[in-house]
Amino acid sequence: MSVYQATASAPVNIACIKYWGKRDTKLILPTNSSLSVTLDQDHLRSTTTARADPSFQKDRLWLNGTEDEIKDGGRLATCIKEMKALRKQLEDKDASLPKISSYSVHISSRNNFPTAAGLASSASGFAALVASLAALYKLPTSQSDLSRIARQGSGSACRSLFGGFVAWQMGELPDGSDSLAVEIAPREHWPDIHALICVVNDEKKGTSSTAGMQRTVETSPLLQHRIKHVVPARMAAISAAIRTRDFDAFARITMQDSNQFHAVALDTEPPIFYMNDVSRAIIALIVEYNRVAVEKTGKLKAAYTYDAGPNAVIYTPKEHIKEIVELIVKYFPQAENFKDPFGLFGAAGVQGKVVDGFNEAVSKPFGVGAVKGLIHTRVGDGPRTLGPEEALLSPDGLPK
């Protein structure tokens, strides 16, 4: 008997121009366009296996081995239903295709990083879900069209259907058909963009993004200014910076937009605080590092950005990443040795230090554990279809 199964992985993306606020909460249509960098799946990814079988009684999903309820009308159910509908269209056109759109599916998904740690697990998770179902159903659908479906699971998931540098175009139509992701440039266009993720807190956050952003839409006058007057110009400017590989402009816009996102969180009633003292100290370090860089070269060398949580992501060209790691480790000593995937430091490991001319008084040193971990990664590719040896379901259709 045929086994209808496919496995795919999808990447994490970290926004430079932030998505914050929905104009339609059911369809997940944003109040503004956004732009992100896709990170390397060799370091951060969600992997998902989907199987369709006539013996399955209902659609079921397991995340990191624990079953998650698929609520009727919920985001998971919506994505699965939309993907089944695309498969049914194929079957209706070609009588020779097996009618697997009518079968229930079992889906098993794993992240190789902590879920809800402020690393965008919902984005990579829903992108991997859509990618695995697209492979299972052998859909000829374009990535942009698939991104419309991923968007209905988690807004930022639509951006994880591409590698490199990705825009989520907010669209204008009320049905959301023009709210989708497009690639601004592939990974190969600017491969030397590296990222250092500073994991400040790997617990669940206090205010979820979904609840927080709608409170901002309802109460923040600053958000309305941002949507109308700030984001459109920044989207154009950062897209141009990416196309011309202008890191100075890319960094400046990325930091400005992170700052404004946290300003609209603060402008919300009651205010929302995602950053903590450690987050703010990392900003102070990068600002001072850049001050020295501008003095010497006239250009910025690093960009911080923060999503809805305290974790910092620092973008920098490959040639400067070593200095950035040394700087962070000097102020935030690590309990465990730095995992050095690119072999920057050799057997001796990383020693904390600052660059010449750096004013060390910009922040106090913190104790071990203030930054719980450092993840060094780089710009990466889009979803990958994996072989059966990487499947997460056993022959009985339950998680391995």
UniProtKB/Swiss-Prot annotation:
Pfam families: MDD_C, MVD-like_N. Coiled coil: none annotated. It catalyses: (R)-5-diphosphomevalonate + ATP = isopentenyl diphosphate + ADP + phosphate + CO2. Transmembrane segments: none annotated. It is an enzyme of class 4 (lyase). GO terms for molecular function: ATP binding; diphosphomevalonate decarboxylase activity. GO terms for biological process: isopentenyl diphosphate biosynthetic process, mevalonate pathway; sterol biosynthetic process. Residues 381-400 are annotated as: Disordered. Pathway: Isoprenoid biosynthesis; isopentenyl diphosphate biosynthesis via mevalonate pathway; isopentenyl diphosphate from (R)-mevalonate: step 3/3. GO terms for cellular component: cytosol. Induction: By methyl jasmonate (MeJA). Keywords: ATP-binding, Lipid biosynthesis, Lipid metabolism, Lyase, Nucleotide-binding, Steroid biosynthesis, Steroid metabolism, Sterol biosynthesis, Sterol metabolism. The keyword Cytoplasm does not apply. Signal peptide: none annotated. Its EC number is 4.1.1.33. Diphosphomevalonate decarboxylase; part of the second module of ergosterol biosynthesis pathway that includes the middle steps of the pathway. The second module involves the formation of farnesyl diphosphate, which is also an important intermediate in the biosynthesis of ubiquinone, dolichol, heme and prenylated proteins. This module also plays a key role in the biosynthesis of triterpenes such as ganoderic acids (GA), a group of highly oxygenated lanostane-type triterpenoids which are well recognized as a main group of unique bioactive compounds in the medicinal mushroom Ganoderma lucidum. This is Diphosphomevalonate decarboxylase. It comes from Ganoderma lucidum. The gene is MVD.
